[in-house]
Amino acid sequence: MLPSTLQALTKKVLATQLISEDDYYTLKCCGLWWHEAPLMLCYDKNHQMLVKTPILKEGLLLNTALMKAVQENNYELIMLFTEWGANINYGLLSVNMEHTRNLCRKLGAKEGLEASEILQFFFKTKRHKTSSNIILCHELFSNNLLLQNVDMEELKMIIYWDLKDLTDNIILDDNTSLSEMLTKYWYGIAVRYKLKEAIQYFYQEYEQLNEWRLNCALSFNNVFDLHEIHNTGKVYMDIDEMMRLACIRDNNFLTIYYCFALGADINQAMFTSILNYNVFNMFFCMDLGANAIEESKALAEQKNYHLIVNMLSFKNYSPDPFLISKIIDPKKINTMLKSYYSKNMSTFDYMCIGYF
């Protein structure tokens, strides 16, 4: 959408230019100043406008920036972002003063939002996976009373699909408050997408959620965060329980290896992988030395996992000597497994070719 006035267009052009400190006074006079720093515009790979400052260095989508400006009762930026094309109705999600609500009305906002609109705005806002945006989403939504008006089952479904690989998705429990559910949700998103600044923010603000962070790191194969939170000594979990959590999601080679290097039982890891029909994990466990083949085969038979039974019927599996050094440096683990293909899966592939 084009800016509604020549002045707004001029400001938009100015905000996209490379600037020096000599230009700061001009930017202040033009209202291109936010959080005691210059306000800049750029576009992401999807051609969406992003508002940036040195604090919001990853940028916010224009509608999200509007919500932040409304929360701060920053009239100048509310009007500017609206002229640049922001949907003023987004501001109704964060308005906290009546005179700011009146300004939003003057700029075209509705009297109130329907429950479906609240959920739609929530869905669109959370899609931008950066530290700046996830932290702001937490600030805007986790204690937002408007979210109590939405269809809670729909909200939980959104959360479920974003965190569906979490091993124990306890945040969807009916006994969990909306605020706690959303706080854990944003924390989980930060760990899943390796948003370092957001992870550190939640770690400092919510020390009581350290076990949740560990759970997320194991579930989402984030070996770097797993190493960091495990080494703090602020959360304890049995190593075999850690391995169990890592094995519930397939292809979690990084966190499975890390738990293996710490001494977790690799045969139990193989059993967990089979119970969850995670074939890639199963072969990786054999690469790491799991040798309870007959027990695993019996378990697969109990579950009627016929393909796994057939896989375990071959006898030529053996550990991969390349993997048994038990290193715990996450960088080295990541390098070692970056393009790893299971030795035993290759063996199975070869035997299948010969068999058929």
Swiss-Prot record:
ANK repeat placement: 61-93
Taxonomy of the source species: Viruses, Varidnaviria, Bamfordvirae, Nucleocytoviricota, Pokkesviricetes
Any single biological process term in GO: taxis
Keywords assigned: ANK repeat, Early protein
Record-stated family: Belongs to the asfivirus MGF 360 family.
Full protein name: Protein MGF 360-19R
Induction remark: Expressed in the early phase of the viral replicative cycle.
Domain of life: Viruses
Function statement: Plays a role in virus cell tropism, and may be required for efficient virus replication in macrophages.
Pfam families: ASFV_360
UniProt keyword Nucleotide-binding present: no
InterPro entries with a match to the protein in the record: ASFV_MGF360
Gene source species: African swine fever virus (isolate Pig/Kenya/KEN-50/1950)
